Amino acid sequence: HPTNDFNYYIEIIKSIKKLLPNVHIQAFTPVEIVHFAKISQKSIYEVLTILQQAGLDSLPGGGAEILDDEIRAKICPNKANTQEWIETIKTAHKLGMKTNASELYGHIETIEQRLQHLFTLREIQDETHGFQAFISFPFHPQNTQLDNIKPITSYESLRFIAISRLVLDNIPHIKAFWMMLTLPIAQLALAFGADDLDGTVEEEQIIHAAGAKTGQKMTTAQLQKIITETGYTPVQRDSLYRKIK
């Protein structure tokens, strides 16, 4: 939000934790943490420490897009740069906060840049061991300034998930986000290296604004059925990948 100050977000975390003390709060991408640091004139370490003390438990891995500043300058010039994203992730890990990692592929990046992103994540994980999962997002060009780009194919998405599983052997889990991939491709992804069918979403606006036609809601029972149909055993987990049932 362009006008809210850092204290606004601190109070949100405190309020949630006060109301629901046993709930695990995963919030704020590295890009948002960098934004908080800039508007509060604090270091990334200070921002994360304050949020952790307020009740923040872990971070999602969003905003990574492609960790290459040449690409970032073209597709997301106002977001945190590569070094800021990496610094935020490493700092969170050093503070004992788990995070996820992500990648947006299928836009203007080269194959080499797409793969280098994976190797960068692998190097971070070798150092910090703080990533829980990797999730890749195929770019949806419709209704964007890059709407002339041919959408990535389902085959390319499945191949990239398989490559991710091979390269990121030090990251425990690979997600298949059905809302980005479509449900049939996410189901197939379970045979291509993914082990986390994500997720029971109530509402999603970003990719649907870019023309996605997938649904916006999936129940636990529906996900269990899809996993069972594929020949696997569904396991419900919490935010730290601990088995619930």
Predicted region positions:
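Conserved Radical SAM active-site core
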Residues: 1-103, 107-116, 123
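Auxiliary Fe-S-binding modules of radical SAM enzymes
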Residues: 18, 40, 94, 119, ...
